[in-house]
Amino acid sequence: MIRQCLHLTTSPLLLLLLIALSSIGTVVAKSDGPKIASIQLETEPSMPFYFENSDTVLFLRLDTGEVYQSFDGGVEWKVLGKDHETEGETAGLANGAVMIQAHPYDNQKAYILGRHGVHWVTTDQGKTWREFEVPAAPSMFNEPLRFHGEDSGKVIFQGERCSAFACVETSYYTRNNFETVKPMRDTARGCMWAVATPGFADSTTEHAEEIRDRVLCIVHGLKNPFASAYRLVYSDSFFEDDQDGIEAKLNEGRPVAGIINAAARTKYIVAAAKSQGTDELAMFVTDDAITWHRAEFGNHKIEESAYTVLEGTNYSIEVDVMNTDRSTNMGVLFTSNSNGTYFTRNIEHTNRDMSGLVDFEKIAGVQGIVLVNVVDNWEEIENDPKADRKVISKISFDDGRTFQSLKVKDKDLHLHSVTAFENIGRVFSSPAPGIVMGVGNTGTHLKSYTKDGDLYVSDDAGVTWRLALEKPHKYEIGNKGAIIMAIKDNDKPTKKIQYSINHGKDWETAELDREIIPYFLTTTPDSTSLKFMLVGYVEDPADWYIYAIDFEGLHERECKDSDFENWPARLDENGEPDCLMGHKQFYRRRKSDANCFITETMFKTPKPEFKSCKCTAEDFECDYNFVRSEDRKECVPATILKAPEGTCKNDDDTFKGPSGWRLIPGNVCTRDGAVELDKEIDRPCKDALKTPSGDSKAVSSTANYIETEMFGEFFYLERAGSSRGEDETIIMRTTDGKLYVTHDHGKSWTHELKDVKIQQIAPHRYLNDRAFFLTSGKKQYYTINRAESFDAFSAPAEVNPSGLTLGYHEEFKDWMIWTGPGECSHGECPKVSFISKHRGDDWEILLRAVEKCEFMAREDRKDSGSLIFCDQHEGEKVDGQRMLVTSNDFFATSTTPLTNIIDFATMAEFIIIATRNPEKENSLKVDASVNGVEFADAEFPYNLEVPVQLAYTVLDSSTHSVFLHVTANNKMDQSYGSIIKSNSNGTSYVLSLNDVNRNNGGYVDFEKLPGLEGVALANVVSNTKNVEKGSEKKLTSMITHNDGSQWTLIPPPAKDSEGKPYSCGSDGKPTDKCSLHLHGYTERRDPRDSFGSASAIGLLFGVGNVGESLGSKSEASTFFSSDGGISWKEVKKGNYMWKFGDQGSVLVLVEELKPTRDIYFSTDEGDTWEKYQFSEKEVTVQSLSTVPSGTSKNFLIWGKETGSSKLVTINLDFSGLRDRTCNLDEDTGESEDYYLWEPKHPLQEGNCLFGHVEQYHRKKPSSHCWNDWSEAHVHRISHNCTCTEEDYECDYNYERQTDGSCALVPGLLKPNAIDYCRENPEAIEYWEPTGYRRIPLTTCQGGKNLDRWVSRPCPSHEEEYQRKHGPSGAVIFFAIIVPITIAVAAGYWVYTRWDGKFGQIRLGDGGAQSFVTSRGDSPFITIPVAIIAGTVAAVKVLPLLVMSLWRSVTGYVRIPGRRGPRPYATRDAFAARRGDYTHVVDDEDELLGDDEFEDEEGDERN
């Protein structure tokens, strides 16, 4: 309901006077007040806005979807599509709107977005509206409309298309203002135009043709759906020529993963990236959409949701960076140089709020004037965040170089700013030149808005201030400063409005027709109109009122030239016009006492005039690769300068080099007779970059002796891709509890926490910079900055003696779970889990009598932020039956989905729970969940010949399916079992490989190769019948290239490393008598080692032999493959350890546990090997390590000097081998230094693997350069292939035949396919089983359709079935075979293109421990992971560093968890370090299940 009224405020006396004056012919027609009209609404008006330079205003009623429009500033209103039949309107507009958006650069255009794909546009300020359709709803996560900064007809529409399973963000574009609309592409975080602002268009005229149609989009990773893999891609053809686009070269000519946001600011585009394993952001900036640079903030760390890009200028970016804990909300204000690359600190302790808003505003229209609020008592707030903060206001007149107090005469003035703003629009200023207003108080600091606030005004851009009105007011400025309106704002009803026509010196009063509580006051964005709109409500929230207040009648005279002044926008300390950016700025503005209004040119925004100045030092900035010195007086090199070729023959020479200064681009100062800081200067050659020699002599070694008996554990705290710094940090604990730290990869070590004995190191599972150092007492220590400093907290209990002590949260970095022994008077004390949300500052009890509790949060697991799983004893008794207890509210309430459990483990999206089988004595069964809410029994294949399931090992789930090892024999030295593979929700399994080797500790000889989809190696026991009789195992190595669907022997090389043939007569093809066999995971000294590295795709090492079966390690040779295991060659006789450097540019070998002084290295993918002597004395090498990502040029040898007890670490530095970075052309893929390598299957043509062809950059072996890339990178998915038999595997109850087909297991019935309908009531159809199912990883399209031949309608859905597609209709791609809801993060796109590489999990069947690893953007984690058996809980802890002489019962190496990258010691295979890790137990009697079942069997025998 709308009620309208109009009244004119006049006094009777003045009315009589006006009548009398008119009767004698005087031309005076003033009114004594504004005209006021109002309407009443039943709900709050939303999204009000004026068309700039007009009196046309719109707002939206959210409850009805109605759009209200007025052409006279709010006097008369109509509902579009309802009240009037205006040209172009349609009936759907009457109640179909969800938002209104004005075009930011074209004041004629606005858009109304509807609910159901129907939208409207106006190109004439609302006079007419035109309907257009886009088949998507407006995006809820991205800005629905993105505008072009030069051509207002170009608009990107960002929407979402939803299915029953998920919503997909997608973008459309128009080049003619939605006359036509075309789809562009699916996105992750939306798209934007490169030319996104008019300022960008003006500053890039030289690139106009190249970037005119360029679009930038944040899209999913090629193989990973999570934010850590998001990419920034661009296209100049709306992705028509190339569907994926070209990745933007953000960092030194290389793409960057983890793009979380991109935005345009004036003449810049800013992109933020966050790598996995860190909370630190990297910011990248471009001013031409072609060349990008990383923005440098000195030593300040930028975190997600902890920085704010503020309103900048056309020559700099303003960023406020939080520099304290989030609870204190204070920041540092930075200003960039002109290309946005180097930021300098302007002012510290800026006042922020929890949402990231900062008390900062640039004065509109005036260059260089900035208002900020800072926290005066910042030290007190940092010590006590709950203390009252004392905020003070500061102003700068020189672009933030210096700040001073605001003054009312001799008193300091403090104003409420953005964080406490009580209106809409700008806070202090408007386009009205020089008029600045605010609510605040004088005194020592800012006080209460309501109780102490008054309205203050300045008409000289903040130089001087005066009291305008007592008490707080909402205020607006109109007619370019000629009229100021205000209404009291103290949360009390009022009917009085006040206005001033002389810059706030004097005020008049008018009254509304009723008292209201003001909600907001606004006018046209350019502050040119004489009309204002006031919105308020009475105490009943159902009664809202909109007032249109028109001051046009106050004066009738139009301002003349004599009514204007030439006002200088900035004054120096002497009161003279000041220079900035090489000019002085002036405005022609109405004098404050002029008795006139500006009506003829009312809607023209004031424009400044400029006068040039001579260049001074302030007109220069630091050149690229230079930064300000500490005293800000010089520009010093940010990197070592390179001398020109032919110069610097001696260190005493000099060369002509840059001064470090440059004139700020856009600065218009005159150079004649002025300062010239940018002239070249003489620089000393001794400070120039020395070119590496490029030969083997350039390899260096640095030895350090550690005074201890044995190394204990060590971890790399590797910098993630978005982290700043150059360090390569390792933390190491010795067996006597000493902590050593190196920041230069072992070239030097320091002893830290000298008075503390460290029992364990527990690196943070998700953040590389963090690690915790656990002691035997309550006081514990940690670092959050890669061991630069250390802090302490008090633990709620002692360290867990038999399991994981600390658990970490994936999203909330300071949330932790501590599990340790509770207090009791006698006997075994039950364990208690505690939670802290503040990094150990305080603790609360989660649950008592537990084995473990874990956070279950995952980015793709809906509503899992507070989800916690606990393994608890029933009745809180130590000997009580164990049950799975879950909660989403920290156990204020809880559920118990499963009882009588043995353990649970998480692996990528899967949660696997082992429980006792109630139907089979002494046997286990598996339950699975994806969403953490619904659980289902796992269906094992009937041809799985394991009558009593004694233990499980969860091997891998990196390819949308779980590999599970089911133990068939767990007797000492006889263990083996079958590997089965699940469907996409972990509940239905098929047999993959029989008789796979398992050791006494429960670990399995199975390993996925890092970075290669579907490639795995396993060792099988070839003589199981003899083993059952007590014979020694004979192992045979097998390999799969299609994710376990088919296994083959490993092809042997034709000749050995000496060119001799093998005795078994190898011809390069594997046979039962002659194939390659490799020692696997169960024989590794260090469980973090792997065959390959995720950063060196396709490069593999292994130790083994060629023959009929696997021989002894003492007689083994070292083999190498460069094509992902398809072919191999012997590179060395003997047992060598290996590591990969610089993504495979350097391969290093060193002999294991034999005295040596030499290593071998290759720089040509293993074709040739050079020897390097690293020590004069022989060293027995116990381990060889490098950064987990395999991207460093440094390696570290850990060993003992032969013949002595001295422990030594030796750093090997290869950085001097090459003198340049390889040239990469990401656009074309190949270049002089790179070729594109495609993984392939040895038995398939066309390099198709899992339905697509992948391409990776590989450095050419002949190129003498460094990759210098921090992460492995897929160049592109070349194309999807047509489906073949290799894209299918045998379905449940079917098995592979000798001819390769799948047939029903004899004696079994086909699965009852109609069960799917019962389990999924909304399903329309089901498919008759064919014996085949698609491999979850495949993305093939078309071709052979082996899994869906005949579809049937589900009962009660026959009509829908016929309507949908009939017998051959669309496939329900996400079919779920058992009653469990799959948690899908990104819909069909994610399912078909994500390989889910998140590693492997180990639930140990020993000593209540588990072993879990994971890998986010990196392909695979290779450690077999979950072992479950018996009755003792398996808990996630790190496996013991299995190096002889280093093991101890209490020592273990903790490696971080699932999402990484995370720090751990040596395993290249965990390139980005994603994983959970668990304790590898020395005491095998503690193994889960094995000994208990044996005891029971023994009892029966007795």
Curated annotation (Swiss-Prot):
Ranges facing Cytoplasmic side: 1391-1422
Residues in coiled coil: none
Membrane topology: Multi-pass membrane protein
Superkingdom field: Eukaryota
Subcellular location: Golgi apparatus, trans-Golgi network membrane; Prevacuolar compartment membrane
Regions of this protein lying in the Lumenal compartment: 30-1369, 1444-1502
Segment forming the signal sequence: 1-29
Keywords: Glycoprotein, Golgi apparatus, Membrane, Protein transport, Receptor, Repeat, Signal, Transmembrane, Transmembrane helix, Transport
Any GO BP annotation: Golgi to vacuole transport
Family stated for the protein in its record: Belongs to the VPS10-related sortilin family.
Listed name of the protein: Vacuolar protein sorting/targeting protein 10
Species of provenance: Talaromyces stipitatus (strain ATCC 10500 / CBS 375.48 / QM 6759 / NRRL 1006)
